[in-house]
Amino acid sequence: MSITGIKGFNDLLPAESGLWQFIEQTARQVFARYGFNEIRVPIVEKTELFCRSIGDTTDIVEKEMYTFMDKGGSSLTLRPEGTASVMRALIEHKLYALDSINKLYYMGPMFRHERPQKGRYRQFHQIGAEVTGAADPLIDAQVLLMVSRLFQEFGLTEPRLQINSLGCPACRPAYRQALVAFLAERQEALCEDCRRRQGTNPLRALDCKVPGCIEATQGAPAMVEHLCNECDQHFSMVQNYLTAAEVPFSLNPRMVRGLDYYTRTTFELVTGLLGAQSAVAAGGRYDGLVEQLGGPAVPGIGFALGVERVALLLGDRSFEKTPDLFIAVMGDAARTAGFRLMAALQDQGFWVETDCEGKSLKSQMRRADKLKSRYSIVLGDTELVAGSGTLKRMADGNQQPVHLEAATIAAAITGGGQT
């Protein structure tokens, strides 16, 4: 019996890799315009990192983390998200001392033990960005602007930006009290998890996906109605900056996100095209996280997008790459000459294929068609003696004579086949 992959851990096949490369390359280009540098962190961290950052009472920590004991007896976890690892690296390497503001981005796999479904997998991939060192609402607006522009570069206009404010430690207690009182009157309608968390983390009820909890929390108090003056001004300025930059957004007072470290501004890009998995990107401010992990009081804000979900939205768009030239050869001398020509053209940046199986000319041309090569050329004794051949444009059959020199063929391919 053959060995198959693990449920929820998917292979990325060659037919899909062009789309993923487009997503990653586009993100890198946009991040560069906004002054971000890449950071790469391990996929495995000490379990304590995620318990302290994400929160002990979140679904991620309670139910979804891949945690194991290593041979030294340490509890380790496959990272379920990227922000905690980036902040750990920021503290460990004292990046905050090198520059007052750090702009970092990352790409890579994350792991959560969830029920696999469309847009949700046990190994999934995120592209994220973090800014630390500035608490000004202008930074919030810059991050939101960047996210908006990134999706424009993807060619996606359907995802809608929703924002909320979760306040700060000064104003959240009053809101928590109001929310607990509201939930206490609806105990019977809440799921077991939401009832259990009322004493530790009642905000999780607003993020619960159980239908009964969604219905029971309709009309719940909104955090934006309980903001202190400072948080209210901060949130107002974020909205003013977004309006000034003509970034469309809407308020979603129910948005609390699934991680406990968020403060003040939170946001999601949502779509109705992915069923229950409506968020394709999300993030927010986390002003106390670095200090909570043992570092100095460094404010921060960031976001992450789901690569699989963006790929689903891009759908059937073709990012297939095809060879520039297929060199068909007849005879040993032609095979050697074809190999030399192929190497010279590859050195100039062209994708060139040739026969490696000793097949007939007819079979070689069938392979050129199958590969969807843009051009083909046949090399045999006649062509070698003449020092020239016929370059064929495969799309329409147009043929042009060319000298068997890499520079001449390169110019013909680049110029559309005209020599």
From Swiss-Prot:
Belongs to the class-II aminoacyl-tRNA synthetase family. It comes from Trichlorobacter lovleyi (strain ATCC BAA-1151 / DSM 17278 / SZ). Its main location: cytoplasm. It catalyses: tRNA(His) + L-histidine + ATP = L-histidyl-tRNA(His) + AMP + diphosphate + H(+). InterPro entries: aa-tRNA-synth_II (IPR006195), aa-tRNA-synth_II/BPL/LPL (IPR045864), Anticodon-bd (IPR004154), Anticodon-bd_dom_sf (IPR036621), His-tRNA-ligase (IPR015807), HisRS-like_core (IPR041715), HisRS/HisZ (IPR004516), HisRS_anticodon (IPR033656). This is Histidine--tRNA ligase. Keywords: Aminoacyl-tRNA synthetase, ATP-binding, Cytoplasm, Ligase, Nucleotide-binding, Protein biosynthesis. Coiled coil: none annotated. One of its GO terms (cellular component) is cytoplasm. The gene is hisS. PANTHER family: HISTIDINE--TRNA LIGASE, MITOCHONDRIAL-RELATED, HISTIDYL-TRNA SYNTHETASE. The keyword ATP-binding applies. Pfam families: HGTP_anticodon, tRNA-synt_His.
